[in-house]
A protein has these predicted regions:
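Solvent-exposed loop/turn segments at secondary-structure junctions
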Residues: 2-5, 37-38, 63-66, 85-89, ...
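Periplasmic-binding protein-like
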Residues: 53-61, 81-83, 174-185
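Extracellular/periplasmic Venus flytrap/periplasmic-binding protein
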Residues: 129-176, 181
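Extracytoplasmic "Venus flytrap"
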Residues: 1-20, 32-42, 62, 126-132
């Protein structure tokens, strides 16, 4: 869904890929594909990767879930790992982390730091992981300051630096003095630094 150099989610996956390549060298072959939309194109790319002989395929975005399940049925000898999903199959597993725990702690810090009692949250898409994060952040903030209000602006995209920056500026305009984000670029941080 975004380029490997976007400084966020995809970058972290790419760092892990490079570490695996460094450890195993020519014992493994790694294929990467960037900027795959969460639509029928994902299904095409997954199928191509399986047809090329890849035995383990990482689908690194929630929106790939149904495409992974469909292609996995066609290639029972290929293993698929799907990020942040919740559906599985004999050859499909999910991987994730407890992101909400860190977001709760970030909320506590934000709640203790704000002067306006208005916190901003730039969010990509209303999927379970993002909603958990918003809720955890809000609960963390309200645990130290019950007067906190968290305002959310949705970008409807994981990676759109322009929309992310505009969302941050909108929240600043609404009085938010601490802003966090669940998107893939550093545009929110840059917009806040410029304000």
């Amino acid at each position: 869904v975004s380029p490997a150099n976007e400084e966020g989610w995809s970058t972290q996956h790419d760092i892990a890929r490079r570490a695996v390549e460094a450890k195993f060298g020519d014992k493994i072959k790694v294929t990467t594909v960037e900027n795959i939309p969460e639509n029928a194109d994902a299904e095409r790319v997954l199928r191509d990767l399986a047809q090329q002989g890849n035995k383990l395929i990482f689908a690194t975005s929630f929106g790939y879930m149904n495409s992974v399940l469909k292609v996995a049925k066609e290639f029972p000898d290929v293993k698929f790992e799907h990020a942040t999903g919740y559906k599985t199959a004999p050859n499909v597993a999910n991987y994730s982390a407890r992101f909400y725990e860190a977001r709760y702690l970030a909320g506590k810090l934000a709640g203790a730091t704000t002067k306006s009692n208005i916190l901003g949250y730039v969010a990509a898409l209303p999927i379970p992981e993002v909603l958990q994060g918003i809720n955890a952040y809000t609960l963390g903030a309200q645990s130290v300051n019950p007067n906190i209000e968290v305002r959310v602006v949705w970008t409807s995209a994981w990676y759109d630096p322009g929309k992310e920056s505009d969302a941050a500026k909108s929240l600043i305009g609404q009085g938010a003095d601490v802003i966090t984000h669940h998107t893939n670029s550093s545009a929110v941080a840059s917009a806040c630094e410029e304000a």
